[in-house]
């Protein structure tokens, strides 16, 4: 029986993780989890799984629900996430919280020797060199949960590294893949949140609509697998059935395909290095009638090019890209800027903020905060057309 901690259990990845835990009750035991503010979800899961500790991170809710419920201890605030992952009973940590708040508990889990099922891409994008040094130092196992990276993880394990010429991340194309370019300036938040394939949170759905999510995943793939940016490609695949592709030196391509359901990569990350037992959800290839692949339109998706630019620059540039995007997407979701202003703000940040090569966590965090301040200042001063 493996103890599991899930950071961000009420989100889409967390919800899918619970499905896997229910399917394999003899293999996994939910020992701790966090929610931001959804007490109803937390209460129901405490009643179902009886974890040792839970955490509510919303600062407005500190103390509201007491210090325990049934036999489960209740903690509050982002700092308490570290307590969840350090429990002796926890063997694997699923990091599914959004944004930079995932980095400190991830570092704590690495230093505690826990297996990491990482779904918080911002941790690797912003702090990639630091995280990789810690993983090597503590001999930690880190398995990606994102469907594309998990697919590549499995494909790369089956092939000799010297035989792999390139890796490819697939993308659905998001909510606006077929929308006329001139209409992008005027799309609404509601339109952006209407993803054709996946059910995800608002921020990641907006990222997907502009392929910025895929840009973040390109940077993440670089740090996870060690491929150069020239060896990492992106293709539009509207069916979302093929999740990852590797091209071998003999000219062949190996594809990982599955029904678009997050339970597959989550189950793999929990069971790894052991094989995943037969899942209750099955899909037959005979139901996959069409596979389409085509290159992304960089006029439609300028954020993807900016991600490659930031990744190749290295240092704090990927973190600048990520922080600028987080702030810009928040402004869009509040209907304060247009959809096409998001990449313009990111480009402005990359051009105006000095890139550095931090050696410490604080160095990365300082540049992250500088970027967020810059975006807010640009918006408040009207520095970028909205």
From Swiss-Prot:
Its cofactor is Mg(2+); Mn(2+). GO terms for biological process: isopentenyl diphosphate biosynthetic process, methylerythritol 4-phosphate pathway involved in terpenoid biosynthetic process. It holds the Pfam family DXP_redisom_C. Mn(2+) binds at residues 146, 148, 217. It comes from the Bacteria. Transmembrane segments: none annotated. GO terms for molecular function: 1-deoxy-D-xylulose-5-phosphate reductoisomerase activity; manganese ion binding; NADPH binding. It is an enzyme of class 1 (oxidoreductase). Catalyzes the NADPH-dependent rearrangement and reduction of 1-deoxy-D-xylulose-5-phosphate (DXP) to 2-C-methyl-D-erythritol 4-phosphate (MEP). This is 1-deoxy-D-xylulose 5-phosphate reductoisomerase. The gene is dxr.
